[in-house]
Regions:
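A ligand-binding cleft/hinge motif common to bilobed small-molecule-binding domains
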Residues: 55, 59-69, 157, 162-183
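Short, surface-exposed beta-edge/turn micro-motifs
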Residues: 52-54, 90-92, 112, 196-197
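N-terminal hydrophobic or amphipathic helices and topogenic motifs
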Residues: 1-73, 77-80, 84-89, 223-253
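Short, hydrophobic alpha-helical packing/hinge segments within bilobed ligand-binding/sensory domains
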Residues: 43-48, 149-155, 161
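Bilobed "Venus flytrap"/periplasmic-binding protein-like clamshell domains
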Residues: 2-23, 86-153, 226-240, 244-245
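Short acidic/glycine-rich loop or secondary-structure boundary segments that cap or lie
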Residues: 124-126, 152-155, 172-175, 196-198
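Periplasmic-binding protein-like
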Residues: 2, 76-79, 84-91, 179-215, ...
């Protein structure tokens, strides 16, 4: 069996994630639910989400909507306390180089700026930015596919792309632990919110005892651990929150 919290995992918060998992694990076991001793930090995301022995996973809402809805049980979302954002949701922030003359994300799209994205199955890196552009009657000009949000930030800083959109929580962590990179960048806008990284378990499991164990664990989590993780709550979102049209895949020039 496997448990993983991969979406905001970094070396700097690995011990904090493990401490949170220990509390969740004990809560699950107290409810007669099997749970592994420790988190898995090595299994690729897609493989972990598809495991028939998945105890707890964390998935971006776009791959959930596109490929895993009906294949896993949705539990809820951690709340990371983003300003001007509903609990349990998140948004992307657009960035350019600090010395770029663009005043807004609209300026970037209208000028045909080259857009770095982590992958086409990322809500924050591609899905939400594309929806933002479509709502403005604009289009993105896809550039390098970087494979990771931080790599997209690096692509912009190094001039391999003109702008990018990154998960606001990932950006907040990069500002904390990679300030030499983020100091080269400037935020110029944001997308609409959508469901945050969603906690899931294997298909056929009732979500309620998992949600109860997670809520209980957060109540017991030491404040200094919660501060490292940036987690301030847990929310179970309705299915309607996930009723979002799927984006078209990027079509690089």
């Amino acid at each position: 069996m496997i448990a993983s919290l991969p979406m905001y995992a970094r070396p700097e918060n690995r011990a904090a994630h493990s401490a949170l998992w220990a509390l969740i694990r004990d809560g699950l076991r107290a409810r007669a639910l099997p749970a592994p001793d420790g988190l898995d930090f090595d299994t690729p995301h897609m493989q972990g989400w598809a495991r028939p022995d998945l105890v707890l996973g964390q998935i971006c809402n776009l791959p959930y909507r596109a490929q895993f809805q009906g294949r896993v049980t949705r539990i809820g979302c951690f709340d990371y306390g983003l300003p001007d954002c509903p609990p349990g949701q998140y948004y992307s922030q657009f960035v350019v180089r600090r010395d770029d003359p663009a005043a807004s994300a609209t300026d970037c799209a209208e000028a045909g700026y080259v857009f770095a994205y982590n992958e086409g199955l990322s809500q924050s890196g591609w899905g939400a930015p594309q929806a933002w552009a479509a709502a403005q009657g604009l289009a993105l000009r896809p550039g390098p596919k970087t494979g990771a949000h931080v790599a997209s930030l690096q692509a912009v800083a190094e001039g391999r792309a003109d702008w990018a959109a990154t998960d606001a929580i990932t950006l907040r962590m990069a500002q904390r632990w990679q300030s030499a990179l983020t100091d080269q960048l400037r935020i110029i806008g944001r997308t609409a919110p959508s469901p945050g990284m969603t906690l899931i378990t294997r298909q056929g499991q009732p979500p309620q005892p998992y949600a109860a164990a997670i809520t209980e664990a957060l109540a017991q989590l030491p404040a200094e651990i919660a501060q490292i993780l940036g987690i301030c709550g847990f929310h179970s979102l309705p299915q309607s929150a996930y009723d979002i049209a799927l984006p078209s895949p990027p079509q690089p020039a």
